[in-house]
From Swiss-Prot:
GO cellular component: extracellular region
GO process annotations (BP): cell wall modification; pectin catabolic process
Protein name (database record): Probable pectinesterase 29
Glycan-linked positions: N43, N262
Pathway linked to the protein: Glycan metabolism; pectin degradation; 2-dehydro-3-deoxy-D-gluconate from pectin: step 1/5
Family designation: Belongs to the pectinesterase family.
Gene Ontology MF annotations: pectinesterase activity
Xref: SUPFAM superfamilies: Pectin lyase-like
UniProt-annotated site: Transition state stabilizer, residues: Q165
Length: 335
């Protein structure tokens, strides 16, 4: 994830991100339900056409059910189409794939700038650098985003995110990821989102990197000590091939917490890297609490890793970190 490329991407996105003004209607109220089926037995044959059918400034939950299959398309939910619920047949059965690359702003296979987006049981993949049938991809490694999440109050249940570099751009807003699988090798969870990752599987694909090169799981972009954002990983599994740091700072007050998570030996002993902020490590909030596994030995961590108080940890590793107003409980979670 090149900093200059990210900056360019942010400028491009700002042209589309208008203030979030629409609030959710009561739980259970929905306007319409449509089906996407490539065989022609649904309302639409592509996911994007189904999204396009949602009314501008929609104010009720709109369910889009996607049948099993490989969907070769780029998908975008614009900011003016909130309250979309996108449901697949399973993250191994419904897969959306594209191979755009280089620009983080233009490459996402899936992007949502709308508030109140809910996705369940789908995988979004950027295939540009992704290994095929276990074989190493020989394309030059470059940013290739699988998903960009830019709206507030958005949740993802049993969703897959597959890529190598910059897989999941957790761009902005409050987000909840539950039982998701995120695959990558370099900065593959990055951005300035205020997010909880609960019971997720983080798979390091270090075998796609040059021999001896360690990857990076997170690159979080908190810019000052008063920013509320950060990435909180709760009861997650970190495993894979090769080696990886838990994170490095994209901005000077980066905040990432791993809580009660299983860290295997894919995690490098040092745990964290200061990257471009050597000498300013005291500003970074990189912490682990209650983690276990062969990669969780904090005795070999960098000396500047944060030692947070029990009360600070409990405040961060709690749904209330993202759930002001109780929006998570009000989501129309598909069965």
């Amino acid at each position: 994830m090149g900093t200059h490329r990210i900056f360019i991407g942010l400028i491009a996105l700002c042209c589309f991100c208008l203030p979030h003004l629409i609030e959710a209607k009561p739980f259970g109220v929905y306007q319409q339900q449509v089906f996407v089926d490539q065989s022609g037995h649904g309302n639409f044959t592509t996911i994007q056409k189904a999204i396009d059918s949602v009314p501008i400034n929609n104010r009720h939950w709109f369910f889009i059910n996607v049948k099993a299959g490989l969907y070769r398309e780029k998908i975008k939910i614009p900011y003016e189409k909130p309250f979309i619920v996108l449901v697949g047949a399973g993250k191994r059965l419904t897969r959306v794939e594209w191979d755009d690359h280089y620009s983080v702003a233009q490459s996402p296979t899936f992007s949502t700038l709308a508030d109140n987006t809910v996705v369940k049981s789908i995988t979004f993949a950027n295939s540009y650098n992704f290994p095929s049938k276990g074989k190493m991809n020989k394309n030059p490694r470059t940013p290739a985003v699988a998903a960009l999440i830019g709206g507030d109050k958005s949740a993802f249940y049993s969703v897959g995110f597959a890529g190598i570099q910059d897989t999941l751009w957790d761009f902005d807003g409050r987000h909840y990821f539950h039982r998701c699988t995120i695959q990558g090798a370099v900065d593959f969870i990055f951005g300035t989102g205020q997010s909880i990752y609960q019971s997720c599987v983080i798979q390091v694909l270090g075998g796609q990197l040059e021999p001896g090169l360690a990857g990076y799981i997170t690159a979080q972009g908190r810019t000052n000590p008063y920013d509320a954002n950060g990435f909180i990983f709760i009861n997650c599994l970190v495993y894979g091939t090769g080696m990886a740091f838990l994170g490095r700072p994209w901005r000077g007050y980066s905040r990432v917490i791993f809580y009660n998570s299983n860290l295997t030996d894919v995690v490098v002993p040092e745990g964290w890297d200061a990257w471009n902020f050597v000498g300013h490590e005291n500003q970074l909030v990189f912490a682990e609490h209650g983690c276990f596994g062969s990669g969780a030995n904090i005795g070999r961590r960098v000396k500047w890793v944060k030692k947070l108080s029990e009360s600070a940890i409990q405040n961060l590793a709690d749904l209330s970190f993202i759930n002001r107003g109780g929006w998570v409980e009000d989501l129309p979670i598909p069965a």
